[in-house]
UniProtKB/Swiss-Prot annotation:
Domain of life: Eukaryota
The protein's name in its UniProt record: Adenylate kinase isoenzyme 1
Family note: Belongs to the adenylate kinase family. AK1 subfamily.
Annotated Gene Ontology cellular component terms: cytoplasm
Phylogenetic placement of the source organism: Eukaryota, Metazoa, Chordata, Craniata, Vertebrata
pH behavior: Optimum pH is 10.0 for ThTP synthesis.
Gene designation per UniProt: AK1
Amino acid sequence: MEEKLKKSKIIFVVGGPGSGKGTQCEKIVQKYGYTHLSTGDLLRAEVSSGSARGKMLSEIMEKGQLVPLETVLDMLRDAMVAKVDTSKGFLIDGYPREVKQGEEFERKIGQPTLLLYVDAGPETMTKRLLKRGETSGRVDDNEETIKKRLETYYKATEPVIAFYEKRGIVRKVNAEGSVDDVFSQVCTHLDTLK
């Protein structure tokens, strides 16, 4: 299992809230047969499963604390091991949020093949999030909160991008255009991995 994981294609997908990275991940899954893993989704699924780990996570999250890195990595690894035989590769969405997380991931799971940086400007992301807020009813889609989320995102992400740029595995996609425009750039990068 360990060996298989190490040989898998692993793509970190990084992009701000409203950059459209979720949509791009869905399209990658359809076209390339990759498995899309979002740490947020994994955490939510674990909590609603009512498992012992889920109960522990629920308590941590209710206090507004960060889930321990160890736990997040264990969950990612379990999810990857479960799919390693059938998946063409893995999209790790919203991770790593800091350099240390990336280093730990490599120690425990494997090296990323590529970091796909879905890059949209702050105005575009704000506009998209406000639009989503009209229909989603998500409490975190209002202008004040969005500003804070973007600041947090930039602060956390810049060192991560710089870290992987040194290795030459960052592929930046301009996410200002339409979904299809962005996806054609994504495909250009992914097609080189065959």
